[in-house]
Amino acid sequence: MLIKVKSAVSWMRARLSAISLADIQKHLAKIIILAPMAVLLIYLAIFSQPRYMSESKVAIKRSDDLNSGSLNFGLLLGASNPSSAEDALYLKEYINSPDMLAALDKQLNFREAFSHSGLDFLNHLSKDETAEGFLKYYKDRINVSYDDKTGLLNIQTQGFSPEFALKFNQTVLKESERFINEMSHRIARDQLAFAETEMEKARQRLDASKAELLSYQDNNNVLDPQAQAQAASTLVNTLMGQKIQMEADLRNLLTYLREDAPQVVSARNAIQSLQAQIDEEKSKITAPQGDKLNRMAVDFEEIKSKVEFNTELYKLTLTSIEKTRVEAARKLKVLSVISSPQLPQESSFPNIPYLIACWLLVCCLLFGTLKLLLAVIEDHRD
């Protein structure tokens, strides 16, 4: 057995030594250039399936930009809106996402459409392809690029038929519009929901302070302690003025009447009665007990201040809601189609002249490299 193996090795060495570098160089062009070019031409002639491309250009605008009649010098100078640029990049990521692929597969039966590739094994999509492979194949069939100078998003879609390439692009635009609308409306809804929540809190606080005010009025049987205290103070001042006048009249009587004169006694009694009334009215205004007008006025003022503060706060929240609605409507974003997708008339892929030129260039470079390498080896052997 060992003898047979040694014999086979010796035979192979003899055959290899019989092949000279000159023989390799003689057939190198056929191996490196002609054979690969023949394979490429056979693939292009027999196996390759033509693919058509539909193209559209879109921009993302805010509603106030569309309604504004003012001249935007930034756009004239080629500067894009930073907010629109950010939204365009968001949309680009969404178009290349599995979510967009799922929507397209549901509407266009994407997997089924690209599984019918004929003999084109290089561009065939297996019906049993994994989710990762399916997504990679999808990204190879769509190209989304953003131009930061014009702010436009260029969308190119491919299909094995002109009709599918067009339908592919139209569906991408429809889903993109839905995504932009949902994104902008969701932000507006969140802002409005927050404003409405704050308004509801302010309304509850206002209702609570009003209920506290009504309860205080009912429990103390008083409408406005401040007004009543003011009226009582005015009455006391009036009575004190009357008392001063009566005391002056009494002193005048004493100038010509005795102390026990009926007129003097009557005047003194009247002054005492008036003083008693003054003391009674003063006791209603100020006293250590908690049911007096001065303490009631302080408590009432505090409750009334709460009502006024909560009323102003509620008004502010109502104004905030209206401003939020206007601002949300102003900032709503729309997908503006600048160039609509068209039905392609000619296939775009494969680009046969380009492929042949590139393939020939690569083969020639490889041929030259190997030619040089063999020449170096030949020199060393010599």
UniProtKB/Swiss-Prot annotation:
Subcellular location field: Cell inner membrane
GO biological process, one term: polysaccharide transport
This protein's UniProt keywords: Capsule biogenesis/degradation, Cell inner membrane, Cell membrane, Membrane, Polysaccharide transport, Sugar transport, Transmembrane, Transmembrane helix, Transport
InterPro entries: Bact_polysacc_biosynth/exp, BexC_CtrB_KpsE_VexD
Any coiled-coil regions, as ranges: none
The protein's role, per its UniProt record: Involved in the translocation of the polysialic acid capsule.
NCBIfam families: BexC_CtrB_KpsE
Family classification: Belongs to the BexC/CtrB/KpsE family.
Entry protein name: Capsule polysaccharide export inner-membrane protein KpsE
Species whose genome carries this gene: Escherichia coli O6:H1 (strain CFT073 / ATCC 700928 / UPEC)
